Amino acid sequence: MRLKSDLGLVLLAGAKGEFSGLSSLTLEWDERVALGVVLAAHGYPANPRKGDAIQGLPADGPDCVVFHAGTALNGEQLLSSGGRVLCVSALAASVESAQQVAYAAIAQIKLPGAQYRSDIGARAVA
């Protein structure tokens, strides 16, 4: 989320072994704070439950993106398929603001038995 430049160009140059071309690329970064909160399945880590329906995912926007990890589609139904199911990532001017954005998005997500830490970023603001 913080990299504004085209990551594809960087990866393509590296894959082609054109490392001299990498020095000509200017990487532009978003200077805002990035914060990510992982939603884990019920029973994680020892025995994560699979097959729970996931609903209420917020639309991705410039300040918040939901990354999928342990998810699967069954037709049009999104289901949990592993321990770490989603990562809600937020960008904001401060850690406190990023926390508010991320946890507001998490409040919209419906995943039975989901668990997540409520203290992400807390040490940075203490």
Task: Annotate the PLM regions.
Residues M1-D60:
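Active-site "cap" helix and flanking loop/linker of ATP-utilizing ligase/carboxylase catalytic domains
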Residues A40-Y44, T71, A93:
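Short, glycine-/Ser/Thr-/acidic-enriched flexible segments
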Residues A46-R49, E76-L78, S97-Q100:
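Extended hydrophobic-aromatic, low-complexity segments
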Residues K50-C87:
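Generic long, charged, amphipathic alpha-helical segments
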Residues A104-S118:
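Short arginine-rich
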Residues G121-A126:
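A cross-kingdom feature marking charged/low-complexity
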